[in-house]
Amino acid sequence: MDNSRKPGVIAFVCAMPMELRPLVRKLSLHKSQIGDLRVRAGTLGGHQLVAIVTGMGTRLAKTETGRLLDAVGVQRVVVVGITGAVDNTTPIGTLVLPEVVVDSVSGVEYRPAPFGGGSPHGKMWTTDLLLTDTDEVAGLRARGVVSLDMETAAVAEVCEGRGIPWSVFRAISDRATDGSIDEEIFHLSHRDGTPNGPAVARYLLRHPALIPRMVRLGRGVTRAAETAAAAAVRACSQP
């Protein structure tokens, strides 16, 4: 990618490869490299596009977003991916456009820049912890939290520190308190978001009755990733 310092670049930031995959397909992004940074790149409506996978959690999100912004002259950062619901009624695949993203550790609130229309509402809660306790999640819901994620506030912190507008498109892939995800399932992925194949195989051998649940979870994740990517592409396509 030989024009990484030109203005007008839109950067997509995903935590996991499965969140990036729909963007690659919808935007025909190709593999590229900027220095030692591996990216996907393309164009849309006169904009240069670049996309990265950071890995899961706030530390990796902050580090990799910083590396991207060091390497590329970015006009806007767009976070794209999945998020967990804090109730048991929100349909899987529902698009979440938060008014505010909260860092669960510092309490700092970040406001996404408007991008592509939509009606933002509620708070997204960024935490490195897997939250499944019913009372804890109910407390967050009472404070206006509508979904949980593990990276967005960290990306926002880096962007705002550099004066770069950022937006977020996430969609519901699971529900925090319905039993679909627990610590064991959570750790079936590496921190870079790729599946831990041996761990998955061992889990399914120990719990064959849970295979249908895992299939449903996988379908929900795929649906959410597709929804979030489609919304991000629509926003980028608008004049």
Sequence positions of predicted segments:
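N-terminal short leaders/motifs
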Residues: M1-P7
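Structured catalytic cores of enzymes that bind and process phosphorylated ligands/cofactors
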Residues: D2, C14, R40-L44
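Short, conserved "active-site rim" segments that organize catalytic pockets and cofactor/ligand binding
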Residues: P7-L27, L95
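Glycine-rich phosphate- or other oxyanion-binding loops that anchor nucleotides, phosphorylated ligands
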Residues: P7-V9, I34-P239
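N-terminal glycine-/serine-/threonine-rich phosphate-binding loop
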Residues: K26-D36
